[in-house]
Amino acid sequence: MGKKIAMILGSPDPDSFCRALADRYAESAEQAGNEVRYFRLGEIEFDPVLRHGYNQRQELEPGLKDIQEAFTWSEHVVVVFPVWWGSMPAIMKGMFDRVFLPGYAFKYRENSQFWDKLLAGRSAHVITTMDTPPWYFRLVYRSPAHNQIRRTILEFVGIKPVEMTVLGPVRYASAAKRQTWLDRMSAFARKA
C-alpha cells in the first residue's frame, strides 16, 4: 500500500525546472501506488502576508485550507523550490506563515519556553534547485535556505526525518544533466 503524500511546488513560474521536477515526482509517485495531493503555489490565489501576526485571526483562503487539510492527511511531505537570494521564494514563505498556525501546526505550552509539535509522525523530502554550486552554498553561505526549511519550519512542527536533495548549478546544466535529475525524481518517488 502506498503513502499519502502532500506535495508543494514553491516556484511561481509554470515553466520552471522546479515545475518539471515536481511534476515528474508527482507522476512517478502516483504510478508507484502512492496517493498525491499536489499544490502549485503559483496557481493558488492567496495573500502570502500574515497581516497581524498571531494577534488576530486571518481567514484562510480555500487553497490554503486545502493545503492545511493535505498536511493533516499526509504521511509524507515533498517540497520543491528554487533557492532565490539564499532562501525560498516569498510565495512559499507566505504559505508557511499562513498555514502553519498555532493550534494547527504547533502549540506553545503555558508558562514554558517549549511547544508541542502538532504535525509529528510525518517525514519529508525537500528538493531544491540553485544556480550556485551546492558545495559553495553549503561551505560559504552555510545553507540558509536548507536550515530554514528543515530546522525552523518542518522540524519545528514535528515533521522529521527531513531528507534534502540539492540540485545545481541549474543555469549551466546540460540537457543530459537535467534529464538525470528528472530521472532521480522518479527514483525518489518510487521509494517514498
Predicted regions and their residues:
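A short beta-strand-loop structural module common to alpha/beta enzyme folds
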Residues: 34-45, 165-168
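N-terminal beta-loop-helix "entrance" segment that forms/cooperates
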Residues: 41-59, 177-178
